[in-house]
C-alpha cells in the first residue's frame, strides 16, 4: 500500500512538471484566435458600471471564474493550493481541488485540506473524483469526500484517452452511465461533469442532460493535452508511447464543445475551459453561452511563483474581460451573446 501511495505522489509531481512543457500544449489546435467579437466604436456605457456577475447553481456569483482542478496528494501540493486558495479568498473566484482519489483509501489524506479550509473558510470549493473511481465507490463514501472538504459541489472528471495512455491507467469504464445516474439521483450536492481536454459530443451532452447533471465543463482541445503528458511518462512503453503520438490531436475543441452544449438548450449550466488563456478568450465563451469559465495552466504557473502572482493573473483576466465587454458595448455578460461575429 505504501508503494502504491508513493507511485501516486510521483505521478502527481510528474503531472505538474509535464503540464508546463510546451510540447504538451495543443496550442496549434486552439480555436479562440479564429473566433471574433463585434467591435463597437461607440460603446454607450461607463467602464466602471460593467458587471461580470454570473449565475452558478441558480444563485448569483460576483465572479464567473473557477480555477480548474489541478493537483493534490503530494508534498508540493500544499504550498500550491495554499496560494491558489488565498488568492480565491481575496477575489471570490471558485476552485476545483486536485484528485481526492487517495482519500478513499487513506484517511490521513483528507487532512491535506483541513488547514487550508480553516484558513480560507469562505472559498467556494468543488470536490474531485474520476469517473473510473465513481463506478466502484459507494455514494456514502463520495458524500464524505464532499462533506469533509465542505465543498459546494462535486466534479466528476472524464479522461478516457489519458487512462489509455497512462502506465497506471484505469480503463474499465463499464457501468459509468449507471453509476453517474445513481449519483445524480442520490447525492446531496450538485454534480458537474468535466472532460480533461478532449471535449464533448452532442450525443454525450444529450445523455448528460437527460440524467440531470447540474453543469458540464466542456474542457475541450486547445490547452494542456493529457494524452501527450502520459505519452512522456510512458517513454519506456513503446505501445503507449506510440499511441500517445498517434492521438496527439485527439478531441473536440473548446468552442465546438461549447456550441454542442448550447445547441441543446440544456437544463445544465455550460462551463467553458480548455486552452483558455486570457479574459478575451473567456469573453468569447460567455458570448457562446457559457456561465462559468475555468483556468488551469495560467494559474499553476502563477502559483509556482507566489500568491501575489496568482492575484495579478486574476486581476489581468478580469480587466481583459471587462475590456472585451466595453469594446463590444456589453454592460453585463448576457449582452455578449449578441456580439459574436457571424
UniProtKB/Swiss-Prot annotation:
Substrate binds at residues 11-12, 99-101, 162. Its EC number is 5.3.3.2. Mg(2+) binds at residue 163. It is an enzyme of class 5 (isomerase). Its cofactor is FMN; NADPH; Mg(2+). One of its GO terms (cellular component) is cytoplasm. GO terms for molecular function: FMN binding; isopentenyl-diphosphate delta-isomerase activity; magnesium ion binding; NADPH binding; oxidoreductase activity. It is found in: Cytoplasm. It catalyses: isopentenyl diphosphate = dimethylallyl diphosphate. FMN binds at residues 68-71, 99, 128, 194, 219, 224, 275-277, 296-297. InterPro entries: Aldolase_TIM, FMN-dep_DH, IPdP_isomerase. Pfam families: FMN_dh. Belongs to the IPP isomerase type 2 family. This is Isopentenyl-diphosphate delta-isomerase. It comes from Legionella pneumophila (strain Paris). The lineage of its organism: Bacteria, Pseudomonadati, Pseudomonadota, Gammaproteobacteria, Legionellales.
Amino acid at each position: 500500500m505504501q508503494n502504491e501511495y508513493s507511485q501516486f505522489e510521483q505521478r502527481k509531481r510528474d503531472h505538474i512538471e509535464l503540464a508546463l512543457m510546451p510540447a504538451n500544449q495543443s496550442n496549434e489546435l486552439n480555436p479562440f484566435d479564429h473566433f471574433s467579437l463585434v467591435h463597437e466604436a461607440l460603446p454607450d456605457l461607463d467602464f466602471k458600471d460593467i458587471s461580470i456577475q454570473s449565475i452558478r447553481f441558480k444563485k448569483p456569483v460576483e465572479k464567473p471564474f473557477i480555477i480548474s482542478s489541478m493537483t493534490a496528494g503530494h508534498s508540493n501540493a500544499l504550498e500550491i493550493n495554499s496560494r491558489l486558495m488565498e488568492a480565491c479568498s481575496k477575489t471570490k473566484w471558485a476552485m476545483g481541488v486536485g484528485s481526492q482519489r487517495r482519500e478513499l483509501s487513506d484517511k490521513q489524506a483528507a487532512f491535506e485540506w483541513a488547514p487550508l479550509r480553516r484558513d480560507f473558510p469562505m472559498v467556494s470549493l468543488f470536490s474531485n473524483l474520476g469517473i473510473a473511481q465513481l463506478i466502484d465507490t459507494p455514494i456514502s463514501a463520495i458524500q464524505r469526500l464532499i462533506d469533509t472538504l465542505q465543498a459546494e459541489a462535486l466534479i466528476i472528471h472524464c479522461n478516457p484517452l489519458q487512462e489509455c495512455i497512462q502506465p497506471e491507467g484505469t480503463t474499465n469504464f463499464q457501468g459509468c452511465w449507471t453509476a453517474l445516474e445513481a449519483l445524480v439521483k442520490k447525492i446531496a450536492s450538485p454534480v458537474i461533469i468535466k472532460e480533461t481536454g478532449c471535449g464533448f459530443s452532442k450525443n454525450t451532452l444529450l445523455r448528460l442532460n437527460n440524467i440531470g447533471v447540474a453543469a458540464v465543463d466542456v474542457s475541450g482541445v486547445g490547452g494542456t493535452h493529457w494524452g501527450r503528458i502520459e505519452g512522456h511518462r510512458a517513454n519506456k512503453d513503446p505501445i503507449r508511447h506510440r499511441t500517445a503520438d498517434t492521438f496527439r490531436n485527439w478531441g473536440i475543441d473548446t468552442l465546438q464543445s461549447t456550441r454542442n452544449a448550447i445547441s441543446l438548450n440544456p437544463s445544465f449550466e455550460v462551463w467553458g475551459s480548455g486552452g483558455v488563456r486570457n479574459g478575451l478568450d473567456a469573453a468569447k465563451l460567455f458570448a457562446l453561452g457559457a456561465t462559468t469559465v475555468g483556468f488551469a495552466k495560467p494559474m499553476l504557473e502563477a502559483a509556482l511563483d507566489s500568491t501575489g502572482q496568482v492575484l495579478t493573473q486574476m486581476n489581468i483576466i478580469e480587466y481583459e474581460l471587462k475590456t472585451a465587454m466595453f469594446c463590444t458595448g456589453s454592460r453585463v455578460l448576457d449582452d455578449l451573446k449578441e456580439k459574436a461575429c457571424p
